[in-house]
């Protein structure tokens, strides 16, 4: 059978029913449609459904799909399509010349698809979307102990209910607008800015060239050849160790580190943290792998070799380095987990992901410096707005990414409680024009307040 029209009005259905006996082979069928009761809440995670395209039908015909079938097109709807989709049933019938059924010759019952339960906490998702507001950007919250994605907000967004009926061409064109509402910005790649100093710190100490008690001078700029690589405050901060450099996000400290350890060492640690490849989340077709540049990539794409300035830029998460908010959240989870990496995932009760951890084999000295440095960001550095008495002990890091010719991006990531971390939150504001500590940190604070407010309330009401 071929679907001629879908989603017709009750009036159209009534009118058509009066003439079915004059239209041999044409019949009306009631069809179940998706209803998303929360509208655009978590739209990029849930996704939407739509009729099979010709290309999709060719690829799936041998799996029992047929023309006119509705399938998941984005998000969890697409990722878990094989689980959610049932199997067609059918009847072989004998009919008279008016199309009326005389007898049933054979009957094959349809089978329903299975339910899928996600790791998303709806209350935390609401808090994340409220914190993001109408800023282009993303907020991700994950459980660092197992990789469960608790919230994944992205704006601009859309209402998946609009796809339950045939969408108009005008609305489709609106959804293709310059602000790209279909894009899940949690899974798109941007320069990670100074959040990346977590990786640079780990690379420096693990290289053996910098002991944990290293103290370096900082400057208004570091000059290499004829190029000046400036400090963000244009003055320097005086002598700093790793924890102080992390707290104040001292660029010139990390420039010096990168110059000494070299690009290959920094690049190797970057890849150990999982950058440059997809995280493993189920939204495979929508996730960017980001970019970890190296000499080979630069020669192939820009026809020039890797130079020391590339290492300097990469040390502060700039240059060609690209990472998604989810990858950055995973980096914070590694710090929270004392050097163990987990797989971000959306499917609840997934034993494969829940029990899997990979050690980066970082030394105790490196882990200690990361914890103390990220804590000092909160107590006396660029993240002091999160140093509040009503929350558990936090650790975090800000980032402000240059993005010419547009305004800068703002980042902030944090985990808590520091003693036994159970949540990581990363906020990213695209082209916000403000620093991570000013723009993104308040968003992280708002989500953490929602998380710990809920857990404290649940603890208080537990029997």
Language-model-derived ranges and their functions:
Residues 57-64, 346-351, 445:
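A short beta-strand/turn structural motif
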Residues 20, 49-52, 207, 339, ...:
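Conserved NTP-handling cores and scaffolds of large molecular machines
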Residues 2, 6, 14-18, 39, ...:
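Solvent-exposed, polar/charged alpha-helical surfaces in well-ordered, non-transmembrane soluble domains
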Residues 139-144:
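Short hydrophobic alpha-helical segments used for membrane anchoring or interfacial signaling
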Residues 95-105, 145-194, 199-432, 436, ...:
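Beta-lactam-recognizing serine transpeptidase/beta-lactamase-like catalytic domain environment
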Residues 1-138, 153-185, 189, 419, ...:
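Extracytoplasmic/periplasmic proteins that interact with beta-lactams or build/remodel peptidoglycan
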Residues 437-441:
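Conserved strand-to-helix beginnings and helix N-cap segments that scaffold or border functional pockets
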Residues 20-23, 83, 87, 131-135, ...:
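Alpha-helix boundary/capping residues
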């Amino acid at each position: 059978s071929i679907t001629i029209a879908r989603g017709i009005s009750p009036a159209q259905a009534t009118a058509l029913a009066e003439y079915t006996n004059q239209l041999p082979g044409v019949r009306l069928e009631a069809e179940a449609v998706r209803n998303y009761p929360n509208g655009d809440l978590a739209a990029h995670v849930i996704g939407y459904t739509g009729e099979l395209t010709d290309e999709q039908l060719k690829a799936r015909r041998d799996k029992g799909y047929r023309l006119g079938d509705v399938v998941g097109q984005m998000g969890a709807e697409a990722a878990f399509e094989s689980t959610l989709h049932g199997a067609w049933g059918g009847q072989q019938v004998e009919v008279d010349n008016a199309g009326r059924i005389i007898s049933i010759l054979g009957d094959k019952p349809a089978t329903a698809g299975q339910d899928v339960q996600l790791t998303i906490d709806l209350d935390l998702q609401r808090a994340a979307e409220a914190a993001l507001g109408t800023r282009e950007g993303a907020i991700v919250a994950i459980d660092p102990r197992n990789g469960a994605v608790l919230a994944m907000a992205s704006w601009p967004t859309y209402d998946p209910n609009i796809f339950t009926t045939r969408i108009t061409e005008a609305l489709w064109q609106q959804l293709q607008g310059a602000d790209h509402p279909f894009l899940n910005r949690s899974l798109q790649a941007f320069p990670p800015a100074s959040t990346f100093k977590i990786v640079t710190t780990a690379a420096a100490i693990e290289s053996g060239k910098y002991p944990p008690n290293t103290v370096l001078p900082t400057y208004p700029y570091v000059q290499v050849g004829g190029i000046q690589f400036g400090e963000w405050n244009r003055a320097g901060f005086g002598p700093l160790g790793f924890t102080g450099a992390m707290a104040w996000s001292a660029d010139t400290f990390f420039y010096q580190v990168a110059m000494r350890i070299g690009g290959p060492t920094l690049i190797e640690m970057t890849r150990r943290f999982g950058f440059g490849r997809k995280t493993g989340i189920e939204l495979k077709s929508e996730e960017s792998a980001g970019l970890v540049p190296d000499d080979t990539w630069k020669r192939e794409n820009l026809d020039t070799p890797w130079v020391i300035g590339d290492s300097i830029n990469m040390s502060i998460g700039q240059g060609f380095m690209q990472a998604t908010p989810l990858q950055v959240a995973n980096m914070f989870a590694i710090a929270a987990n004392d050097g163990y990496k987990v797989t971000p995932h959306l499917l609840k009760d997934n034993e494969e992901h829940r029990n899997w951890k990979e050690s980066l084999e970082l030394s105790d000295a490196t882990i200690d410096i990361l914890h103390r440095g990220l804590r000092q960001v909160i107590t006396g550095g660029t993240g002091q707005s999160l140093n509040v008495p009503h929350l558990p002990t936090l650790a975090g890091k800000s980032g402000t990414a240059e993005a010419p010719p547009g305004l800068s991006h703002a980042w902030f990531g944090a985990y808590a409680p520091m003693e036994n971390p159970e949540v990581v939150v990363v906020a990213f504001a695209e082209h916000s024009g403000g620093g991570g500590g000013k723009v993104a940190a308040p968003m992280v604070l708002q989500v953490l307040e929602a998380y710990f407010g809920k857990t404290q309330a649940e603890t208080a009401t537990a029997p």
